[in-house]
Amino acid sequence: MSVAYGRGGRTIIMMTQYSIGADRSGYFHLCSDGALSPQFLICEDDFCVAFNLVGVCAANSGATILSFSLEDTHLHVLAYGTKESCVRFKTMYETSWAHHIGRSRGSRQGAVIDLEIIPVEEREHLLSAGTYIIIQPTKDGKQIMPYDYLWGTGSMYFRSQGHRSLWTVDSAGNRLDMVKAGDIPEKRLCDILASRRTIPGEWLICNRILLPDNYVDVAHFERIYQTANCFRVFLASSRSRDQEIQQRIASYRGVAMEDTEARKHCHEISKQLFGTTNVRLLDTIQRTQLAQELRSKWHLSARQIASLVLLKYSEVCKYI
């Protein structure tokens, strides 16, 4: 279902659904589970690195970033692209972040994140997810609004010309110097980005921040909402809308099932489809089909399915 706002404030409801194939572009909500990463971000340096890595991974994955936000325990991203490009983004981000905390802390306990990739196939879901992502860090009684939150993109949309970016002024409102990535010595740039992956040389960096203006497609995001009024309606998100997004996330994370029970179901489906319970005898296409059936019938997590059908986790993520 989609919502449009006509003259005189009339609300027009339309049903729209997107079909996202493996080779077709679509919208995806990527998010991590804060309960599994309570030590994700513990200092300002962590926030800077986690923030910058969104841009680094966007530049190298092919995924287009429309909105994102960071909290101390988790990350939310709205991306546009093929499923494959979003899987690349996910893998790059998780790997780069794990390397950073391994170097900076010496221990990765409670800090490693696992991003779920949730297809957004209905327009109502898209409208809700886009704003859910940028308002979550400012909820729960926090004394800040989305357009003032430094570690998200809430300040970027439907702004008047000439407005000052959050990341290019200091607390007194004075403009800070910006520098092109290509003008920064390679070692210094690697330290800022916490990555050796390359980014376009003309991208701007200010006060250790890789500016989101370089890679967040603001125009695309604004086209989703069409008007500032529509954006404002969804920004003032109701509790029921939030709960719907949260239920989608919980549902997509899959059922936590004991391995022995999950293996039993895997063998049963394999026997029905291919006449054998030995997954090792199946080819890649058959294992992929088995993975899809396990997801459809039992809604197991991608990680558990990968271990059952003996496929790489990244491969399973592409097709379920």
Where are these regions (language model features)?
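Short Pro-Cys-Gly-centered "Cys-loop" motif that presents a nucleophilic cysteine in a tight turn
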Residues: S2-S69, T82-I320
